[in-house]
């Protein structure tokens, strides 16, 4: 699915855009159930993590109190064969997890088991023709979160949270984010966001908070 041309069309079709992003890798049914909601209906702490016009990398690091690392799960094949877009499925991980914000009290002897936990799931589609070659190369290298790359590149950019979603994860999500398909992930929330570079829409993102499942 190509990048939407205007903010209005993106807003009107946010759910379709999310479905298209997910289906770049698997049927939506295996991912879970996704429902568009109003941002005022998102409970804490999800609201502060999602309902903003900023990079999720920054939000996650502030929330968990530690820098996050990137894991590229999968890269979608370039169907057009022209390498004009780059789509990948990712996880953000942190050695520190803010369980308390989710109402969980971690015991000291549990800390080693929680090292490098998944804090965010995401899918991103990038129009690579609209970014400097060195930025694209760094993104495709897969070693640094996207938000950090764009910040360090000092590009004129606008992050826009277009629509938020309630997510009821399926077994795939549990296995990927918690390491066990038998361990249910609680109801969580995500967002569809866009990033414009020099007023041109360049990036689409589906970003889902991974809550504590203790």
Question: How does the language model describe each region?
Answer:
Residues 2-214:
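Composition-driven recognition of glycine/serine/threonine/acidic- and proline-rich low-complexity segments
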